[in-house]
Amino acid sequence: MFKNLARLGLSLCVAISAASHAKAMEMQMMPSHHSPIGIMGDHLAMEDKWMISVRLSRMAMKGNQLNGDSILDQDVLQQSNPYASVPNMPMELSVVPQDMTMDMLMVGAMYAPSDALTLMGMVMFNTKEMSLATYNGMMGRSYLGSFDTSSSDLSQASLTALYKLYKTPKHRAHLHLGFTQGVGKNNVMDKVLTPMNMQAVMTLPYGMQSSDRSRRLTVGITNVSTLGGYRLGNQLLFDTALAKKSWTYGDQWNVNSWVQRDFGHDLSFSARLHYKSQQSINGRDVSIMAPVQTANPDNYGGQVVDFAVGMSVASNMFGGNHEKIGMELVLPVKQNKRGLQMESNWSFILGYEITL
């Protein structure tokens, strides 16, 4: 009898020890438990858990393209100026964007009131800088000089609900429903060099503004599956303006597909394909009139395909077991932008996540 009880007790101890070890392994964040750092809202948190995230990104653009084909500055100067009827305006475009950078800081927080629902809030701050070249607006079209413009402000704030559709050991999916409010300025002004070789202070074009100040709705779905040692994910998001201002960015679709693999408990690598389709700007700001392509609301939107490679590392920077540092390099594969726009060059994303 005593031997049987001893065996039973030993079996229970082994079972409890194994369960505790399994629970500890479950609680320790594997790098691929969360998707590549460029994906937002990729998972639900456990009930009553918080997750804080910080993302830094830089996007670089250089050169120009017309309806998807690269063109030189001289080709840009032959394009008609839609504001030619305005007094003292040249007939053709006379200011040509050379390069642009956009730096973004995104701070987010997630909280799960239940295992089926996670709430996600995010604020974004961005800084934009652009270099441009000015040419004579009359005969000769000689080069006059270059100048830089910039804007920096809190851009937008959003609140999103993630609702679980299903979750099994190898498959999970959830829905997205989010609202975003543009809070940054949409009338930033800066000093420019005009085709008359004079400096003037003007309202910057749409792409240089911090936001369109619209209220937007985002709906979508995310699913992640485990296949052998790989995690495969897909995310589809649709974004549209609800409360429009004098001008708003067009509706857009974003589709992401990625594959991710762990290497040990601390490291994972990922590859991601991103497709974006966006309509042109709705409306117009009558104060934005200049002989430059970015002042024309028709020269926005289009279709782009990007390819990203990333790495995620489990970290204990602040002494926790639920920290991750991720990074991604994003390169354009295909750019079919609407009208005359700058060409995308590359993007880099660096992020940190911690679950509390």
List the model feature ranges, each with a label.
Residues 124-241, 294, 302:
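Outer-membrane pore/translocation modules
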Residues 39-40, 91-95, 142-149, 203-209, ...:
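Extracellular loop and loop/strand-boundary signature of outer-membrane beta-barrel proteins
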Residues 50, 116-119, 159, 168-171, ...:
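Repeated loop/turn-to-beta-strand initiation elements of outer-membrane beta-barrel proteins
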Residues 48, 101-105, 143, 151-157, ...:
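Residues that define the transmembrane beta-barrel architecture of outer-membrane proteins
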